[in-house]
Amino acid sequence: MNCPIIDQLERLTEHHFKDEERLKKALTHSSVQDSEQGNYERLEFLGDRVLGLLIAEMLYKLFPQASEGELSVRLNGLVNAQTCADIALEMGLPDMIHVGFEMRNLKGRRLTNMHADVIEALIAVMYLDGGLKSVRPFIRRYWQSRAKQMDAGRRDAKTELQEWAHVQGGVQPHYRVVKRSGPDHDPVFMVEVSILGFAPEIGQGNSKRCAERMAAEKVLRREGIWKTMGKNDHE
């Protein structure tokens, strides 16, 4: 394997790689048919679990007052494909990935997923080199600041409710206007949000968007997701 690439990866990950062939596998897509060392798929499977565990551990320590529901939402936001792909781009990993000819013009979600997979495969390599302690510096370097930024202020309630609902089983919140009143220049909307398996809530506002947000906030508070919310967090 190219020594400058190894040196660059060791600087980026703060880890000394012990198995060059395994590292090479982590950077090889399954579309490379003539590859003798294999591809990153098995490593990605392992790395996904290691990442989830270490992010859960980090969140548990960073947010001692957060409920289980809030921790789950934060976890989902930090281990999803987009976050991992963003970190891959930050590290310059796309230029190091070995792909087959037909994959070189990949775009959109499939490209995002591939970049995320390589991050997870890289995590697996570090874990196999030296266990969880070998991965923690890498997690701190790229995920800790992101985790803290998530706490700088509440995200949009609808976005947070959607992520929480996904954690609960993949269902999506459904919003519908149940009442509209008032004059055209000063309308009042009442919107109901429902999630399969949970009681609905109704929000009220001067626009559909505002009413939807208020309904979403009610669910987040009721389910304990925003249990630690301060009085100004939603302003």
UniProtKB/Swiss-Prot annotation:
Keywords: Cytoplasm, Endonuclease, Hydrolase, Magnesium, Metal-binding, mRNA processing, Nuclease, RNA-binding, rRNA processing, rRNA-binding, tRNA processing. GO terms for cellular component: cytoplasm. Its EC number is 3.1.26.3. Its cofactor is Mg(2+). It is found in: Cytoplasm. Gene3D superfamilies: 3.30.160.20, Ribonuclease III domain. The active site is at D48, E120. Its main location: cytoplasm. Signal peptide: none annotated. GO terms for molecular function: double-stranded RNA binding; metal ion binding; ribonuclease III activity; rRNA binding. It catalyses: Endonucleolytic cleavage to 5'-phosphomonoester. Residues 6-131 form the RNase III domain. Disulfide bonds: none annotated. Mg(2+) binds at E44, D117, E120. GO terms for biological process: mRNA processing; regulation of gene expression; rRNA processing; tRNA processing. It is an enzyme of class 3 (hydrolase). Residues 156-225 form the DRBM domain. It holds the Pfam family Ribonucleas_3_3. HAMAP family: RNase_III (MF_00104). Homodimer. Belongs to the ribonuclease III family. Digests double-stranded RNA. Involved in the processing of primary rRNA transcript to yield the immediate precursors to the large and small rRNAs (23S and 16S). Processes some mRNAs, and tRNAs when they are encoded in the rRNA operon. Processes pre-crRNA and tracrRNA of type II CRISPR loci if present in the organism. This is Ribonuclease 3. The lineage of its organism: Bacteria, Pseudomonadati, Pseudomonadota, Alphaproteobacteria, Hyphomicrobiales. The gene is rnc.
